[in-house]
């Protein structure tokens, strides 16, 4: 029922204020003998990938592996395995953040040209001929590239002629989008785009990106022009704009292109061939071809890499169109290197995980609008990170945090003590659950058995469960719906048995801790789905809370669409029609009943507030059954 007092919005700027009235609290009594797509928010270290920012992966396991790869459990631990298992379910969207340390660096390479104008001896007519000679080199950066913002300054050239009279200019720098040594596997290749040459007034190229870790596999290709003024039909063709575009650009590399270098080559060619009628944007410095006639330009020689002069320090002669591509150089994993001290590496990882979930690495992790989320799974993190996950879920208000109890519990009786010591009362919220069991599974990279916590299974199983039942209304718990699978036989621990552990099971149930148990078929199941809120209400059940969060999200989005709309009676009638569509989505299928309507009182009307009332009743669950058997004496009639 609506609250008996005026609701005061939290802010004065236009927004949606949500008030949840939980009218389902149950006063505990004791017997004498006592619509949404499922999305996971994951943070991990991985062999490759864009780093320290949240990215959405919607292409399932293939998209996940293409972006982040998969590595040994011994190096990357459970966080990567959880995310991979969720991706393998094929039933969820992943919001992922790959963490890398500050002392790691990006692989990169700078393409430089060395040129000089040579004059031939005078002929019989007394005239000399000038020829532009150009050689291309891949040059490493002067220092480690710690940020892609330094892509345009990480490599320098002197600009003065060398001993042979060649002047060096930078043409472009290509940098991997993620830190780490994996960037050395990336290569680029530049070839002529003759088709586009016919369509516009620029010299066009194909810029291809390749991965050489398992043969030369083309990852991307772009149509580009190496001139910042190049536009066609109001669309920029400039290589930087095309490749660095956050939506349609490269997911592998970023580039910095230097107009000054290309202009220097053009100016030198005009000295060698003053009769040339091509403009700077039409000139082809890489292949020396006339874009209009496709014939070789006079007075220019592109020296093959095999015939180029000896390279300077950090330089390698290359051909930009080589089928082997131009390899990126350098890059490091920093304190997360595979050969780093294991304890120091673990400490660095834990600090990164804490900073990630606290929103220090990427504040967008806190945004429910940018990255709407269903679950944030623990992954055998230390206490501080577990608490950060719980705080993040509470602050976001759109998802549930599912926390494990590590892999070190050796006695059933110590489960509650671990929870009390680790969490205390700091996680007493309906968006948090505690899952204290662990198991052995096969590492998909090495096929070795490794020990993981409950959240590995939950990461893959919960999205699949929601997909199978077409909604979040079906609990993932109990003897039929909560069967734990996918583990090495007899490896789940601790597992409770009501014939042996009934007192402990009562203790855990009263503390809202979701333990694993054997059922009558000797199958291990998730026995409960309690949230960690203190009072006993309908929202003590995880499925009910998940439905509530979905309804809340739908209502927020609907109300947001009405900002600065009118709220006359005819408008409110229209709004009520819209909200009924949302209510109908949940009615009967996921909840017993739901009603929603817009209204406003005089106080709210004076302040331009529109009030949405939602009333819902969850479906009843079967958790306890009473079996009453009467054994009666037979009667004999005379």
Predicted segments, located by residue:
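Structured, hydrophobic secondary-structure cores that serve as assembly/anchoring elements
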Residues: 1-110, 123-130, 282, 290, ...
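Long, low-complexity, intrinsically disordered terminal regions
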Residues: 11-13, 197-200, 213-215, 232-233, ...
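A structural detector for beta-sheet-dominated domains
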Residues: 21, 58, 97, 112, ...
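Short, surface-exposed linear segments at secondary-structure transitions and domain or protein termini
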Residues: 64-65, 106-107, 195-206, 224-256, ...
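Generic structural motif
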Residues: 94, 153-155, 184-192, 253, ...
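Intrinsically disordered, low-complexity serine/threonine-rich repeat tracts
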Residues: 105-110, 118-135, 139-147, 154, ...
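Extended, beta-strand-rich, solvent-exposed assembly scaffolds of outer structural proteins
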Residues: 120, 124-129, 133, 137-242, ...
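Low-complexity, serine/threonine/proline-enriched polar segments
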Residues: 233-312
């Amino acid at each position: 029922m609506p609250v008996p007092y005026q609701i005061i919005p939290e802010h004065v700027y236009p927004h949606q204020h949500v008030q949840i009235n939980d009218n389902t609290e149950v006063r505990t009594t004791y017997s004498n003998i006592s619509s949404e797509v499922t999305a996971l928010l994951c943070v991990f270290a991985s062999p490759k990938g864009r780093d320290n920012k949240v990215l959405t992966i919607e292409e399932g396991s293939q998209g996940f592996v293409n972006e982040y790869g998969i590595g040994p459990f011994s190096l990357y631990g459970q966080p990567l395995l959880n995310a991979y298992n969720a991706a393998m379910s094929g039933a969820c969207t992943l919001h992922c953040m790959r963490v890398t340390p500050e002392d790691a660096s990006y692989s990169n390479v700078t393409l430089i040209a060395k040129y000089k104008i040579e004059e031939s001896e005078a002929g019989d007519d007394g005239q000399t001929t000038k020829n532009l000679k150009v050689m291309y080199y891949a040059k490493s950066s002067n220092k480690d590239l710690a940020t892609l913002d330094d892509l345009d300054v990480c490599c320098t050239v002197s600009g003065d002629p060398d001993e042979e009279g060649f002047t060096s200019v930078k043409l472009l720098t290509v940098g991997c989008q993620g830190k780490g040594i994996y960037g050395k596997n990336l290569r680029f290749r530049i070839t002529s785009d003759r088709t586009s040459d016919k369509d516009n007034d620029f010299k066009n190229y194909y810029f291809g990106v390749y991965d050489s870790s398992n043969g030369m596999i083309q990852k991307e290709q772009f149509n580009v022009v190496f001139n910042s003024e190049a536009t066609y039909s109001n669309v920029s063709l400039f290589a930087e704009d095309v490749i660095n575009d956050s939506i349609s650009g490269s997911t592998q590399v970023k580039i910095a292109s230097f107009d000054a270098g290309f202009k220097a080559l053009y100016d030198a060619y005009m000295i060698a061939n003053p009769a040339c009628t091509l403009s700077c944007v039409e000139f082809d410095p890489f292949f020396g071809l006339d874009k209009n006639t496709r014939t070789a330009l006079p007075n220019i020689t592109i020296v093959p890499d095999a015939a180029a002069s000896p390279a300077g320090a950090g330089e390698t002669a290359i051909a930009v169109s080589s089928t082997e591509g131009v390899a990126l150089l350098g890059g490091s994993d920093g304190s997360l290197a595979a050969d780093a001290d294991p304890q120091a590496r673990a400490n660095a990882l834990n600090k990164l995980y804490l900073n990630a979930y606290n929103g220090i690495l990427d504040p967008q992790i806190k945004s429910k609008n940018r990255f709407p989320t269903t679950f944030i799974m623990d992954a055998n993190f230390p206490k501080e990170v577990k608490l950060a996950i719980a705080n993040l879920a509470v602050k976001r208000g759109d998802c549930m945090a599912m926390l494990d109890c590590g892999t070190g519990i050796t006695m059933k009786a110590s489960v509650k003590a671990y929870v009390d010591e680790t969490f205390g009362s700091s996680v007493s919220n309906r968006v948090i659950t505690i899952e204290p069991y662990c198991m052995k599974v096969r590492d998909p990279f090495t096929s070795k058995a490794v020990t993981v916590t409950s959240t590995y299974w939950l990461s893959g199983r919960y999205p699949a469960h929601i997909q199978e039942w077409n909604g979040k209304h079906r609990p993932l718990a109990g003897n039929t719906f909560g069967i734990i699978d996918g583990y090495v036989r007899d490896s789940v621990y601790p597992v409770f048995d009501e014939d042996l552990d009934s007192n402990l099971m009562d203790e855990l149930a009263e503390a809202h801790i979701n333990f694993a148990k054997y059922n009558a078929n000797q199958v291990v199941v998730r026995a409960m789905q309690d949230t960690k809120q203190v009072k006993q209400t309908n929202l003590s059940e995880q499925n009910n809370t998940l439905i509530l969060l979905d309804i809340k999200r739908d209502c927020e989005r609907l109300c947001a669409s009405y900002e600065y709309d009118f709220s006359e009676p005819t408008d409110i009638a229209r709004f009520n029609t819209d909200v009924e569509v949302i209510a109908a989505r949940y009615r009967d299928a996921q909840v017993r009943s739901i009603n929603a309507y817009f209204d406003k009182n005089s106080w709210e009307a004076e302040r331009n507030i529109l009030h949405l009332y939602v009333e819902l009743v969850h479906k009843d669950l079967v958790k306890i059954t009473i079996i009453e058997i009467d054994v009666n004496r037979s009667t004999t009639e005379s």
